[in-house]
Amino acid sequence: MAGIVHGILFCGLFGLCWAVTGSRIYPASEVTLLDSRSVQGELGWIASPLEGGWEEVSIMDEKNTPIRTYQVCNVMESSQNNWLRTDWIPRSGAQRVYVEIKFTLRDCNSLPGVMGTCKETFNLYYYESNNDKERFIRETQYVKIDTIAADESFTQVDIGDRIMKLNTEVRDVGPLSKKGFYLAFQDVGACIALVSVRVFYKKCPLTVRNLAQFPDTITGSDTSSLVEVRGSCVDNSEEKDVPKMYCGADGEWLVPIGNCLCNAGFEEHNGGCQACKVGYYKALSTDAACSKCPPHSYALREGSTSCTCDRGYFRADTDPASMPCTRPPSAPQNLISNVNETSVNLEWSPPQNSGGRPDVSYNLVCKRCGSDLTRCRPCGSGVHYSPQQNGLKTTKVSITDLQAHTNYTFEVWSINGVSKQNPGQDQAVSVTVTTNQAAPSTVTQIQPKDITRHSVSLTWPEPERPNGVILEYEVKYYEKDQNERTYRIVKTTSRSADIKGLNPLTAYVFHVRARTAAGYGEFSGPFEFTTNTVPSPMIGEGASPTVLLVSVAGSIVLVVILIAAFVISRRRSKYSKAKQEADEEKHLNQGVKTYVDPFTYEDPNQAVREFAKEIDASCIKIEKVIGVGEFGEVCSGRLKVPGKREIYVAIKTLKAGYTDKQRRDFLSEASIMGQFDHPNIIHLEGVVTKCKPVMIITEYMENGSLDAFLRKNDGRFTVIQLVGILRGIGSGMKYLSDMSYVHRDLAARNILVNSNLVCKVSDFGMSRVLEDDPEAAYTTRGGKIPIRWTAPEAIAYRKFTSASDVWSYGIVMWEVMSYGERPYWDMSNQDVIKAIEEGYRLPPPMDCPIALHQLMLDCWQKERSDRPKFGQIVSMLDKLIRNPNSLKRTGLDNSSRTNTTLLDPSSPEWSQVASVLDWLQAIKMERYKDNFTAAGYTSLEAVVHVNQDDLTRIGISSPSHQNKILSSVQGMRTQMQQIQGRMVPV
């Protein structure tokens, strides 16, 4: 390497001037062991021979600092062997060192007469030794490193042009093992000057990588070796993965592995970890920076791992440090109670302040209190809560199995994740209620006191929960083989009864139920006893044979009469109990509350005063209009009677400009409702008659009418749930029937549903005008008859009875099982009447159990005496609920039917459709045209054979769409059969 360097000139042996640069800054990866230019004074290296060989010469650098060099130029003589040895150089742990030589060399061709003796190379040697005081050069001990040749040599011309050509050569030496070594330079006849000699080794310098510190590390013994080095985490940090790096032979760090993370309370800054500032925190050892304290918390010192919550705020054990501090919620709002006999429904609104947390739930505390509302104690385990008592996520709960005529205090607590850290009464709201009188619980045991040939004396204990004063007991009994088809009832005010007139040696089944002012409880389970064969002393021992003969003959005649009566009874109806039933009905009405028609009062206002409670209009707050009724608007609102909790109510208003007759008809419904008290009958809260508008106040039913509710929730309920709905409606109708009240307008639209899915019979205005009802026709008593729901005898002869209500109940069953479908679809009223007269009945809805459709058909018996009573309907539904397997069989078993089902009017006329697409468009199912085409249903003849499995297979999965398509298919199939003369109604 040659260059022009400006500096101090040195004129040497050859008349050549060098410009030499001063001290250099070397890379951090190089550690110098010897640098001839940095030595102050003479180098004092050993030369051999001492004279005539290497000669030490001083030059000045640009800073006038002397630099010692060695030169030799014995080119005129042959066989030169001039050695120059450095002082002992300590190895300092290095296994491989590097020798950097800067020198100049004279071109032999530029010297005359030296062609045979002038050389242009020299040799470099080293010798390892632990002795730093060796005085002599023993050539045989030295190991040759290399022969050094110049890249550029200078000539006489260069001297004249003041150009110096400086060469730099670097050689590595190793591996070394002893404490130190000597370097030696052998001249064999060259004209050479050693400007500088530098010996160094390489290291990987101290560094910090990934928060791990790696120390100075000497490179390996081989030029390709890598030295593995484990780092140590910097202060205030910890290992995540073991930090490692490799030191390469060139002094570079390679392949960083692993890392350290700043401890909690510290963050990375300039390769180190510094403490979080005041107001900041870091909870974990991560690579994240410190975070500002979340809301409602603070940190007063540096290096905080968490923030302290403000006064009144807390952090749950499971809350992360990044979550704001929160506080317990405020109390629930707007707690409303609704007492239903011995059950209470509670509803409330969420707390105004959730405490800043999303995990608000509710706990319920139940206390039973004395008459003065003191000495309260926990309700105990006998009370049941639905869905649960604690951890409620909803804002409503039902409490059942309470005691009648008892004061209860219910506390609803708002709870969140920090409530335990600061419980307080301000998180709860309470309400005190008094339960009503309820029907008694079931009699659990019946014991025979005396059994004879023709009688049984029974006794039983009082029900466990009488829920009031027991007014009487009712004993139902029947012969075991009659299976409750024909039964008798005996009533008594004591807990015993003598049942007489029984057949000898016959098994009888007995049931007992109790009655309070709230009504009858459930019948007990069956208890079976058999009369014995011991004859009763009816004939004295001294009776004459004639008397005995007459007695026997009379007995035989009596048996024949009873058998004949039984056969006739069976022929009349499978449900009717013939004359006995009529007698029983008269007997049942004795001592039972009976409905009073308000229209029989000379002064209709007297009926209102007697059966409805007057409410001050100031207690009522109307919130919004939810519908329009016959006489005015129907609104929702709130009722707050002094001393009681505020409740939601429905409010019917009488429009302005009414006549006296309209007012009387409007309030007559309140006079009717006020006589009823049953969980499945809409409850009248009261009336407002002393100011305008006149209002009727009833309980509020959140889910509205049953038909709309079912259509909105199509397919969402199980069969058991639907049967439960029917059972509730049937129970309410049984109550009305027992009170001798005929509803006349029983339909799903007149059944209301509350938030707990309890269905209640409403709309007791059939005896008034119904001219605004689109379902009505045929005026009766100023009103109209809803043809589709009304029994044929009521349509033809205006004969409304409980039996006609049973017919309507069968239609309601069909509405429920079809999820609110319109009975008889789009048929006209006249077509409906004609079809019923011809014996047609509605087909079973999709997936309707056979047992339920059979009950519908029983309700639609032409002879009203053949229809079941509501008590029998409720009993049958109870049996179905207790035996769910009986509800699994669906479909229509035509062999067991006496009536042919109706056509489905949703099916287009067979003659009016020419293709599958026409048919699908007619029933508004054209979206499935590609499904039918892809499956090969290209003709109507093929479509009429499709079934539910086929629809599922071709990709039609919606139950309601399957129902609609299959109903239309059934209708088309029936039309085809009619056209072919094969369908004849029975």
Curated annotation (Swiss-Prot):
Q: Which domain of life is it from?
A: Eukaryota
Subcellular location, record wording: Cell membrane; Early endosome
Check the UniProt entry and state the signal peptide residues, or none.
1-20
Look up keyword Iron and say if it applies. Answer: no
Q: Which residues form the SAM domain?
A: 911-975
Which Enzyme Commission numbers does its entry carry?
2.7.10.1
Q: Where is this motif: PDZ-binding?
A: 984-986
Mapped to this chain, the residue ranges on the Extracellular side of the membrane are 21-547
User: Entry's SMART domains?
Assistant: EPH_lbd, Ephrin_rec_like, FN3, S_TKc, SAM, TyrKc
**Major location category of this protein:** membrane
Cellular component aspect of the GO annotation: dendrite; early endosome membrane; plasma membrane
Q: Which residues carry this modification: Phosphotyrosine?
A: 595, 601, 778, 928
GO MF, one term, reads:
GPI-linked ephrin receptor activity
Ranges for domain Eph LBD come to: 30-209
Family of this protein? Belongs to the protein kinase superfamily. Tyr protein kinase family. Ephrin receptor subfamily.
Supply the name of the protein: Ephrin type-A receptor 4-A
Tell me the organism: Xenopus laevis
